[in-house]
Design a protein with these regions (language model features):
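Extreme N-terminal leader/targeting segments of oxidoreductases
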Residues: 1-12, 30-36, 136, 149-179, ...
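Rossmann-like dinucleotide/flavin-binding elements
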Residues: 18-31, 175-222, 365-418
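Glycine-rich active-site loop/strand segments that organize a redox cofactor
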Residues: 43-95, 174-176, 214-275
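Glycine-enriched catalytic-core subsegment of oxygenase/oxidase enzymes
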Residues: 48, 200, 291, 296-299, ...
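Feature captures the FAD/FMN-dependent oxidoreductase FAD-binding
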Residues: 77-153, 269-272, 279, 286-315, ...
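Glycine-rich dinucleotide-binding loop and its adjacent helix/turn
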Residues: 79, 85-92, 145-206, 211, ...
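Long, internal scaffold/assembly segments composed of regular secondary structure
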Residues: 235-331
Length: 483
């Protein structure tokens, strides 16, 4: 065992360098004074969080300018509607760190895994360890754990048969010639954003290949053409407005009605009766290209691939089987946002000196937004006095997956009502993540006025829906006990 211990002093320690952690870091740097010390702990070899593990052909859902930290702008002159690539996102993260380094001193510790923390004497002792067993101890005034969504790297599925080739999306690029030029069929498992990206890649770059999808219950997306139209003066509904509309409709029991309304009014996907929605965004052109290029779309869930009389066959949970040729490619596009087994931890410690950003105690829909607003609360000493609702999304997704997106939209909208009571307007105007920035200023002003006019009435209704969710499913959904 390596007994080497490095000890550091800091005004703030941040764990992680993904979009959640970087938003927390950017906001905190606005409150810290020039020259104050921040220690950044990241288990990977470089900044970027999940974007280091994402498949190479991934692109953003939203226009690139709306994916940032704090109010830090993108560099370059890409069109506003441009959907950034993985490398461009990582380059922007580097730009974010440059901005923060100009404000405060940042000690970046890559290759260190956070292990634990303890509060004592009004400060936080943070411990981490590297691959060599060396230990790091940071004595910090505040700690922000930017775990975020913690997306899993793509992992091949395991099957009984060894006569098929099971891969993840990244392997398509690594084995491009084999995949693109082979004769064996390709089966994509999944119907979310990863599956659609994978299908779009294959049908456009390997035209003529047999590409099939097993889509489970089906997934639908928000129409990018409607949510982010090229003519910004013709915006009818931004994702913010969509979230608010969902929250006003959901009463804690009617997720099927809300799903049907949302699919019919704003949705797009491969099948009309898709059951799943995860806040993804897709254009009509992308959807049409994929639908036209696929050989088949199969509803159901893949349980196994087994050999029958020496020949592999797909086995669905329903018991339906389908023979496939030996050498068939099976691309796993499922489980990337499956909650990891992290234990529950409230978003704030009783002292307010530790902020934890995770799905186990979620307060706002996306981890980036959660980090942005919760860090503002932390540095204004409002973290333990603002009665935000939290929801244990990890448990909710297990016991009530169909309701989970509508619960998340409702809790986010409800908490925005509370945040608007305690944070200055500037905190909202400076949020570079705000989807309403896609609209011209007069439209944004009108949206703010509409929100202000309805927030008291809507807030009471949303709180009742969240209380119903808690009672109905038995999940943690409500204020922290000490708030």
């Amino acid at each position: 065992m390596n007994d080497t211990v490095t000890r550091l002093q800091a005004d703030l320690c941040v764990v992680g360098t993904g979009i959640a952690a970087l938003n927390a870091l950017a906001v905190a740097s606005e409150y810290l004074e020039q020259g104050q010390q921040v220690v950044l702990i990241e288990q990977r070899a470089q900044y970027g969080g999940m974007w280091n593990d994402a498949y190479p052909f991934v692109r953003l859902h939203q226009p690139h300018e709306l994916f940032t930290a704090g109010s830090i702008p993108w560099q370059g002159d890409r069109p506003r509607s441009y959907l950034a690539t993985r490398q461009e996102i990582l380059d922007h993260f580097a730009n974010i760190l440059d901005f923060v380094r100009a404000r405060v001193r940042v000690d970046e510790r890559y290759g260190w895994e956070f292990t634990e923390h303890e509060e004592r004497d009004g400060r936080v002792l943070v411990r981490a360890r590297n691959a060599d067993g060396e230990q790091l101890e940071v004595d910090a005034a505040k700690l922000i754990k930017g775990f975020g969504v913690e997306v899993r790297p793509d992992t091949p599925l395991k099957f009984t048969s060894d006569h098929v080739r099971s891969i993840g999306p990244s392997t398509i690029v690594e084995r491009r010639d084999e995949v693109y030029n082979g004769k064996e069929p390709i089966w994509i498992v999944g119907a979310g954003k990863t599956a659609m990206d994978t299908a779009h890649l294959l049908v456009t770059e390997a035209p003529g290949r047999e590409v099939n999808m097993i889509i489970g219950g089906g997934t639908f997306f928000g129409k990018r053409d409607r949510l982010f139209p090229n003519n910004r003066w013709r915006v009818q509904a931004t994702p913010n407005m969509l979230q608010a509309a969902v929250a006003r409709r959901f009463d804690g029991t009617n997720e099927e009605d809300v799903r049907r309304w949302l699919r019919e009014k704003y949705g797009i996907g491969l099948v009309p009766e898709a059951k799943n929605y995860f806040f993804g965004i897709l254009s009509e052109a992308e959807n049409e290209t994929i639908a036209r290029g696929l050989t088949s779309t199969v509803r159901g869930y893949l349980a196994d691939v087994r050999d029958q009389d020496g020949r592999p066959e797909l086995v669905l949970r329903s018991g339906v089987t389908r023979e496939v040729p030996a050498g068939t490619w099976i691309v796993n596009c499922t489980g990337l946002i499956t909650p990891v087994g992290r234990p529950y931890e409230p978003y704030s410690s009783p002292s307010g000196n530790v902020l934890t950003l995770s799905l186990r105690s979620a307060t706002v829909l996306l981890s980036s937004f959660m980090a942005y607003f919760m860090t503002h609360l932390m540095y204004r000493d409002l973290l333990t006095t603002t009665p935000l609702y939290q929801v244990d999304y990890s448990e909710l997704a297990k016991v009530a997956k169909p309701a989970s997106p509508y619960v998340m939209a409702t809790i986010a909208q409800y908490n925005l009502c509370l945040l608007s009571d305690v944070l200055p307007l500037r905190s909202f105007l400076d949020c570079g993540l705000d989807f309403d920035r896609w609209m011209p200023l007069p439209h944004r002003v009108a949206a703010v006025a509409a929100f202000a006019a309805r927030r008291k009435r809507d807030g009471a209704r949303m709180r009742a829906a969240l209380d119903t969710t808690r009672d109905r499913f038995g999940v943690r959904c409500g204020p922290l006990e000490f708030v």
